[in-house]
From Swiss-Prot:
Its EC number is 2.7.1.39. GO terms for molecular function: ATP binding; homoserine kinase activity. It holds the Pfam family APH. One of its GO terms (biological process) is threonine biosynthetic process. This is Homoserine kinase. Keywords: Amino-acid biosynthesis, ATP-binding, Kinase, Nucleotide-binding, Threonine biosynthesis, Transferase. It catalyses: L-homoserine + ATP = O-phospho-L-homoserine + ADP + H(+). InterPro entries: Aminoglycoside_PTrfase, Homoserine_kinase_II, Kinase-like_dom_sf, Pseudomonas-type_ThrB. PANTHER family: AMINOGLYCOSIDE PHOSPHOTRANSFERASE DOMAIN-CONTAINING PROTEIN, AMINOGLYCOSIDE PHOSPHOTRANSFERASE DOMAIN-CONTAINING PROTEIN-RELATED. The gene is thrB.
Length: 332
């Protein structure tokens, strides 16, 4: 989350007239990320996040905001969009769609342990099942068609070895996506970007027997209807890796995957294609980071991510991928 669109005090005062959130006490930009303009907003009624959507259109936005409301109604801890005085969940600010959502409690855990991965795995499975009856449809906009469209623009900037990997993996993924097994994979609304910095943890209540409590998932603006296994792969590729090498941490990966399976067991097709999907998850973020690194947009506050991180992860997943762990327990 970065700041591409500035909001002055007078802009904010005019905007807040459409909400019943009391008086503004504090307002500041959030510098991390690369997609939308985000601001922390504190009022006499509580703490919120204001987002100006730089790419998503007014036609696309209801999928994301309504999904968050749907998940919140199913007791999945996510930010809840705040209705305006006309009942709408978003309006226009500087001609761009914008919304206010509740701010979750807690802080990101950037050095997660096994206990954090257990919490994330269970909640991710709960989120997938909670989304089964969500009515709106929106594909993952950063999936295969987006890769095919944008890889040619990246190629002039990279080495021959990187180009060979980028193009060979694109061909591999295109064949996988066209297969009958891929079509049979369970699907539904997915977060598609569940990195460490998009999950909050709070201290667990005394006497619960737990050291950590998951505060919630946020930043759903890359969400889309996709294969659930893709969502799991994206999550594992961030939560369960050695950041220097991209190698999977077996203890954390097993903890997350076993916890997920206690809520939703994996199918036979998912087990067969775990390696392919881990590669897909790594490829998606390698492509997007290459694009953002070499073809950036101007922004007031912008911190581009290192594309090499996901190149290392992709090469590692091609070389080594353990099977999904077995489990014999399921609950809801």
């Amino acid at each position: 989350m970065a700041v591409f669109t500035a909001v002055s005090d007078s802009d904010l005062a005019q905007w807040m007239r459409h909400y019943e959130l009391g008086d503004v006490l504090a307002f500041r930009g959030i510098p991390s990320g690369i997609e939308n303009s985000n601001f922390f907003l504190t009022t006499t009624r509580g703490e919120y996040v204001l987002t100006i959507f730089e790419k998503l259109t007014a036609e696309q936005l209801p999928f994301y905001l309504d999904l968050m409301r749907h998940l919140a109604s199913h007791r999945v801890p996510v930010p809840d969009p705040v209705p305006r005085d006309d009942g709408a969940l978003f309006g226009l600010l500087h001609g761009k769609p914008a919304a206010i959502v509740t701010k979750l409690d807690g802080a990101a855990e950037l050095a997660p342990g096994v206990e954090h991965c257990i919490e994330v795995g269970q909640m991710l499975a709960r989120m997938h099942l909670a989304g089964r009856d969500y009515a709106r449809q929106q594909p993952n906009l950063r999936s295969l068609p987006w890769w095919q469209e944008n890889v040619p623009a990246i190629v002039p900037f990279i080495s021959d070895a990187q180009r060979a990997l980028l193009e060979s993996e694109l061909a591999h993924q295109a064949a996988f996506f066209a297969s009958d097994d891929y079509a049979a994979l369970p699907s539904g609304p997915c977060h598609c970007d569940l990195f460490r910095d998009n999950v909050l943890f709070a201290h667990a209540a005394p006497g619960t027997g737990h050291d950590v409590r998951l505060g919630g998932f946020f930043d759903f603006y890359f969400a889309g209807c996709d294969k659930w296994l893709f969502d799991v792969a994206v999550t594992v590729n961030d939560w369960c890796v050695d950041l220097a090498t991209g190698v999977l941490d077996t203890a954390r990966a097993d903890a997350l995957l076993r916890a997920y399976q206690t809520v939703r067991p994996f199918t036979a097709e998912e087990r067969r294609h775990w390696s392919d999907m881990l590669r897909a998850g790594a490829y998606r973020f390698w492509v997007s980071r290459l694009y953002d690194f070499y073809l950036p947009r101007a922004a007031e506050m912008l911190k581009p991510h290192d594309p090499g991180h996901f190149e290392r992860i992709l090469r590692e997943r091609i070389a080594h991928t353990p099977a999904l762990p077995e489990t014999h327990t399921a609950c809801n």
